[in-house]
Amino acid sequence: MKEPDAIKLFVGQIPRHLEEKDLKPIFEQFGRIFELTVIKDKYTGLHKGCAFLTYCARDSALKAQSALHEQKTLPGMNRPIQVKPADSESRGEDRKLFVGMLGKQQTDEDVRKMFEPFGTIDECTVLRGPDGTSKGCAFVKFQTHAEAQAAINTLHSSRTLPGASSSLVVKFADTEKERGLRRMQQVATQLGMFSPIALQFGAYSAYTQALMQQQAALVAAHSAYLSPMATMAAVQMQHMAAINANGLIATPITPSSGTSTPPAIAATPVSAIPAALGVNGYSPVPTQPTGQPAPDALYPNGVHPYPAQSPAAPVDPLQQAYAGMQHYTAAYPAAYSLVAPAFPQPPALVAQQPPPPPQQQQQQQQQQQQQQQREGPDGCNIFIYHLPQEFTDSEILQMFVPFGHVISAKVFVDRATNQSKCFGFVSFDNPASAQAAIQAMNGFQIGMKRLKVQLKRPKDANRPY
């Protein structure tokens, strides 16, 4: 019989030729097995290299996890076996609590006495720094989920301990998956400071921040048509916000109206700015002799308009706004590559077209796949090992796009099972972006995996990747 609190284990990194009868001798030494099932693809029936294991006794599962997880490598495998509670063993089975807002003077014994009335405590540890000083928080593990839940219901926010700045916090400790997601969110926020979009503007960051704010205001007025531009403006503002948080922008910029000039650049004539902005080998577009006002005033969208038509002819406001951005699209192709191709002319309201025939769809998919697999110049292509199984092309693109313009991002997939092989390539258009990505992401931990990020060796190198 299975105990009520028995744990269902996930077993990974097992050879695909091993079935249940082959795996049982490995796990039976730790206790009687209630159920062992190899996971197979529901469509192809192929072995997926993992299994679910449930012992009759909870202690047997804990012993197996302690003895095998990351400790033993099965024949034919490159990585050690994974033995850990399955995802289905979710918060309902948790017994470990996080306790916050403790007083700095409270010891392990003080915390244990506080929680002992609710049940049997397996572990109680106050977290401390290298110097032994309490961090004001602790972990407490009960024998059952019910005991842990009772402690939460009674103690959370019930009192403020001496030396604490707020009421007591008692909650279930984060799972490994939740910690991994939080780390990804933190790095996504921090990576903005590496963006070449922000760094290449240098001393004119105040000008560009004002420009992007005005662009955001412009696209908000035409949100029905310009959602990709709104997205790009939001991304750019996030990059600038990340730099501001690191002290690289000294002067805050407030949103300006269509007739005012941002305070941070009021003393600098715009005529002096394009000369410095002519970077990457591009020269600024000269103003046209069509009766334009003096260049020391900003226009409502933050840039000089360059209309394609005579001023006497009626000009669509949306077309004029786009024309005013063409100068910056030319000067910064990496920054606006997601925006410029989308609006070569104002979008027209047309009836929805029927989907293309299957043959045309297949050709389009092949073209997209070929485009995704393009590589950059030597020194611009990086290889990423140890990706999480669930990561797709879009996830690694989102992870690495803050470092620069990404030409392609590809996760390699097993053709037989359609499962990720847990490695992939990302190609940039310049070596500096690739090096910044390697320095920031090599060794970055997601869940129980640490990414290995390195340069892809040139094609003529006679060495394996």
From Swiss-Prot:
Signal peptide feature range: none
Pfam family, one: RRM_1
SUPFAM superfamilies per record: RNA-binding domain, RBD
Keyword DNA-binding: no
Annotated SMART domains: RRM
Family: Belongs to the CELF/BRUNOL family.
Protein name, per record: CUGBP Elav-like family member 3
UniProt source species: Homo sapiens (Human)
Taxonomic path: Eukaryota, Metazoa, Chordata, Craniata, Vertebrata
Protein's gene: CELF3
